[in-house]
Amino acid sequence: MSWLFGVQKNATPQIPDDFQAGAAPGGPQQPGQGQRQEGNSKMAYSFDSTALERAAKAARDLEKFPNAKEALELSRMQEVTRQKEVENETKKIEAQLANMKSEHIRVAEEERRKTLGEETKHAHSRAEYQDQLARKRAEEELAMKARMQEESLRKQEESVKKQEQLRKQTIEHELALKHKYELEKIDAETRARAKAARDNRDVNLEQMKLHEEENRKTVIEKIKTSGELIGSGLNQFLNDKTKIAAAVGGLTALAVGWYTAKRGTGVTARYIESRLGKPSLVRETSRITPLEVLKHPIKSVQMMTRQKKDPLNGVVLPPALERRLRDIAITTSNTKRNNGLFRNVMFYGPPGTGKTLFAKSLAQHSGLDYAVLTGGDIAPLGRDGVSAIHKVFDWASKSRKGLIVFIDEADAFLQKRSKNGMSEDTRAALNAFLFRTGEQSRKFMLVVASNQPEQFDWAVNDRFDQLVEFTLPGMEERERILLQYFNEHIVTPATSGSRSQRLKLDNFDWVAKCNEVAKKTSGMSGRELSKLVIGWQASAYASETGVLTEAIVDRNTADAMVQHEHKMEWLEKEQLKARNQEVKFGTTLKRETAV
């Protein structure tokens, strides 16, 4: 009913100046506070009489109004609503005051925290500064101590130097005095001896004359006595013919014995070496000697009891080459049986194609011994290379069973004599080889293997009756080689049943896998394929489980192919370089010939 008393509806109550936000609404009042509030309420709520008159008039009009009760109820409800709004406004103001107080507290705490931080920072800075000052003082003290120590050491060194100098001066003075005294002593002794010699000169001369006279008489008597004895002995010797003959015979026998011992020892040693030992150039041989029997008795017995076997056993070659090599083996065996002349053979082709293996098998099949030489061993011998070659062929000529002399890598010393840079020793060794192989022999057969036969001297090529080329294995040969080595190095150890054998074979078709690998390894030699299978075995041993899987085979095969490609690239570069050098040498030779 604010409209009855002239109070505006939207008027906001004023907050007293001395209102405290933290005081409770019904809290106790301070002394004198009630009187001030009473005086202020009279001033704040005083109204004039016109308002009452209007209210009375409005009440009378309202009583006359037919809807007076509803209007009164509406007014009461509006008054209640207004009171609620005033209460809400009051609560908002109280909340704002509380927020202001909390903000004031927060700001105060923030300021206090900042103050503490600044104080801490200042204290830290002060502590650091004090620490720096302390360190500086400590460093200065250490530096001062170091300077004092250096000064003390310097003074001590100077003192020691002075003492050492004084000691040296004292010693030098003592030595000088001692030397002076010794000189004076020697001078005095010399003068005394000289004076004594002058005083005793006549006596000394008389003694010397007597001594020399006695020596002269003694020497003359010795000469006379020796001459008489020698003369009487010669007279007796010359008058006795028996003694003369005995002396001449003794001297002759002594000379003959000395010469025989000197020359006979060397001849006997060479004979024993040629019969019992083997030449130094022979790297490997199946020929049994007494020395070999003493060194390796078991191996010697096995070699003596060995039987003939197929020369192509374990050697995988193309069919045409197998037929030709089998004919050579049969021819060699029949030649030995009929005591005919052996034919010299040259095997040429890429390395690792079975040349050395077939040469050894050929010797075992034909009943001959074999001796393996290496061409690279001759060049380091220098001037001794010629005698070493003669020893080899002399040793081969004395073989009772017959001997196959196999020279591997023969192009190392059988090169063309017109080649630039060939040493005189190598040329002499080549001439000795040509001399010993000029005619065919019934005692030995010469087999030479080379990777570069085009480097041979023409005279060397004329010594060979047959030239056999060993080519790289084809598809079928690679399959046979892989299966053979796989069975030897992997299948047999894996199925041996030995507890100490770690190798195991995974469940896969290894025959098909070998055929697949054979298709990928085109251009590889038999030795490379053997190393490939051995690499599979090594990888299986290196694995955690010791099982050879298909993945291990594929991985090692890929690595081997990459390595083979690198080798082929290196070989092509080397061949190109060699051809360029030959062309350059030929051009230079033509120019020199033209000049």
Curated annotation (Swiss-Prot):
Gene Ontology annotations for the cellular component aspect, listed alphabetically: mitochondrial inner membrane; mitochondrial nucleoid; mitochondrion
Example GO molecular function: ATP hydrolysis activity
Segments of this protein annotated with the region Disordered: 1-48
Cellular localisation: Mitochondrion inner membrane; Mitochondrion matrix, Mitochondrion nucleoid
Coiled coil: 80-107, 140-175
Family annotation (SUPFAM superfamilies): P-loop containing nucleoside triphosphate hydrolases
Membrane topology: Single-pass membrane protein
Compositionally biased residues, Low complexity: 20-35
Keyword Coiled coil: yes
Keyword Membrane assigned: yes
Positions in the Mitochondrial matrix compartment: 261-595
InterPro entries for the chain: AAA+_ATPase, ATAD3_N, ATPase_AAA_core, P-loop_NTPase
Residues annotated to bind ATP: 349-356
Residue interval(s) of motif PDZ-binding: 592-595
Null mutant phenotype: RNAi-mediated knockdown results in an increased adult lifespan. RNAi-mediated knockdown at the L1 stage of larval development results in arrest in the majority of animals at this larval stage. Some surviving animals arrest during the subsequent larval stages. RNAi-mediated knockdown in young adults results in a gradual decrease in the reproduction rate over time whereby initially fewer embryos are produced as compared to wild-type animals, and eventually adults fail to reproduce. The few embryos that are produced by the young adults are viable, but animals arrest at the L1 larval stage.
A biological-process GO annotation: mitochondrion organization
Domain of life: Eukaryota
Bilayer-spanning residue ranges: 244-260
Record-linked Gene3D superfamilies: P-loop containing nucleotide triphosphate hydrolases
Database matches in Pfam families: AAA (PF00004), ATAD3_N (PF12037)
PANTHER family: ATPASE FAMILY AAA DOMAIN-CONTAINING PROTEIN 3 (PTHR23075:SF0), PUTATIVE ATP-ASE (PTHR23075)
Record function comment: Essential for mitochondrial network organization, mitochondrial metabolism and cell growth at organism and cellular level. Important during development for the up-regulation of mitochondrial activity during the transition to higher larval stages. Regulates mitochondrial iron homeostasis. May play an important role in mitochondrial protein synthesis. May also participate in mitochondrial DNA replication. May bind to mitochondrial DNA D-loops and contribute to nucleoid stability. Plays a role in regulating the production of reactive oxygen species in response to heat stress.
Protein name: ATPase family AAA domain-containing protein 3
Lineage: Eukaryota, Metazoa, Ecdysozoa, Nematoda, Chromadorea
